């Protein structure tokens, strides 16, 4: 289990990889004590917060209040933890932009039901239309993934700083150091796509990056399905992370019909 996730929450923030890759975006730094480590940061909408790397249910109310008083906001707080905060003293809210999309591994393996019929069709078209092979994404194949990433970035028509290109590029340079896993897909020896992520709790896999060449019809539906099958049966959930309020990203994630939205509450003292 990721040692950052003492409370075993499904949030993608509880990952050294994400903390490191987005350190400049959120201006992260470590505070607190040895037994009560906090990550201080700034949200994308410029709110200062503290993220506890310990189970907040194990500390007293006075200590919890002091942390919030000293830092302004506690984030992310899971819905199951809200009972720790009196509505007379605290207020809380969440932004959909921050919420993680979680899917059962079984859903991505089977794409069940009428609403996922198009996903099944696209998967079938890929399997019937292409000769493919999958290889583990290790440092030896990082260059191939970097080429897929570079081509994907060019296809967006955006600057490197306007997408997750830079963070993905850095992750591909540190696959083993960050204990990341994934696969690269080849279609008739052409580079088709890759996924990269990590286990963030005993039963949750965080899918940090998925980049594909869409000239191969059905590649995204295939790669999600394929890698879900590759994961250990102990992995029950796959976290597609947040959409950051980007309409196209939100629409793409919603089409897979998430089984759970992990809302990340911000808790603060009332004025």
Question: Which residues does each predicted region cover?
Answer:
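A mid-sequence, solvent-exposed acidic-amphipathic segment
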Residues: 143, 147-208
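Short, aromatic/basic amphipathic alpha-helical patches
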Residues: 83-91, 252-253
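Acyltransferase donor/substrate-recognition loop-hinge adjacent to the catalytic core
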Residues: 89-158
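A structural signal for short, well-ordered beta-strand segments and their strand-loop junctions
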Residues: 72-79, 102, 134-137, 184, ...
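Aromatic (often tryptophan-rich) hydrophobic motifs at membrane interfaces
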Residues: 182-270
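Conserved donor-binding loop and adjoining core beta-sheet/short helix segment
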Residues: 12-81, 186-214
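Short, polar loop motifs at secondary-structure junctions
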Residues: 77-83, 121-123, 244-245
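Short Lys/Arg-enriched alpha/beta "domain-start" segment
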Residues: 1-5, 11-16
């Amino acid at each position: 289990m990721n040692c950052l996730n003492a409370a075993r929450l499904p949030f993608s923030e509880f990952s050294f990889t994400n903390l490191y890759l987005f350190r400049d975006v959120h201006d992260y730094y470590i505070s607190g004590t040895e037994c009560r480590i906090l990550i201080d940061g700034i949200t994308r909408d410029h709110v200062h917060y503290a993220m506890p790397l310990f189970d907040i249910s194990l500390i007293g109310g006075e200590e919890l209040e002091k942390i919030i008083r000293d830092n302004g906001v506690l984030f992310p707080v899971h819905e199951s933890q809200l009972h720790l905060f009196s509505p007379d003293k605290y207020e809380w809210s969440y932004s959909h932009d921050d919420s993680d999309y979680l899917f059962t591994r079984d859903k991505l393996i089977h794409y069940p039901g009428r609403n996922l019929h198009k996903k099944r069709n696209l998967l079938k078209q890929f399997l019937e239309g292409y000769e493919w092979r999958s290889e583990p994404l290790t440092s030896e194949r990082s260059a191939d993934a970097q080429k897929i990433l570079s081509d994907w970035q060019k296809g967006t028509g955006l600057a490197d700083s306007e997408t997750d290109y830079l963070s993905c590029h850095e992750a591909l340079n540190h696959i083993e150091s960050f204990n990341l896993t994934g696969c690269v897909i080849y279609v008739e020896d052409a580079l088709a796509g890759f996924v990269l992520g990590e286990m963030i709790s005993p039963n949750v896999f965080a899918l940090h990056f998925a980049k594909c060449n869409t000239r191969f019809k059905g590649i995204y539906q295939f790669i999600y399905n394929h890698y879900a099958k590759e994961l250990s049966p102990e992995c029950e959930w796959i976290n597609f992370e947040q959409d950051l309020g980007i309409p196209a990203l939100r629409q793409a994630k919603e089409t897979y019909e998430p089984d759970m939205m992990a809302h990340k509450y911000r808790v603060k003292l009332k004025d």
